[in-house]
Amino acid sequence: WDGRRHQMRRLGDSGIFELFIPGIKEGSIYKYEIKNRKGEPMLKADPYGNYCELRPNNASVVWDLGQYAWTDQDWMKERAKQDTKDKPLNIYEVHLGSWIRKTLSINEDGTEVIGSEFYNYRQIAVKLAEYVKQMGYTHIELLPVMEHPLDASWGYQVTGYYAPTSRYGTPDDFMYFMDYMHSQGI
């Protein structure tokens, strides 16, 4: 990709631009090249991208969201029949990165030394579903899972509104997370 050769074209007066580059494969990274008021080129991530590079990098990643094979059709049909006013509702609000991280080691006194490495969405799904059911919760509310630059934050400095954060895996891993929660009745 070369911003001088591959220029986007505007679709009428819609404010929408498009570009086709043959041979792009899933996993390819890309950015938009935009000229500022001084005419200097700047590289920016796709504000509508659905997958981003792992921090500290910030390019958008080509990803096919249609390849995941959902298994929650029965849960979705059952949910449509439910009246939420007829059953108790107990919501567990959780930030995935704060809730659990991988253990680096265990001290002599048995305390864990928690590391900075995250579990992935698939691993978190199993652990969180077990915890939520054990504690009697019926629903979960995730604190921001959109892409954001800083691990120390809860994700409110969003850089990719349509991209689940890559620090826990791919968009397919996130879809698995949701699918698994539904399979557990959550």
Q: Where do the language-model regions lie?
A:
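Short loop/turn segments at connectors of secondary-structure elements within structured domains
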Residues: 2, 26-28, 136
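The feature marks proteins involved in alpha-glucan
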Residues: 11-93, 98-118, 123
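Aromatic-lined carbohydrate-binding/catalytic grooves of carbohydrate-active enzymes
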Residues: 102-119, 130-176
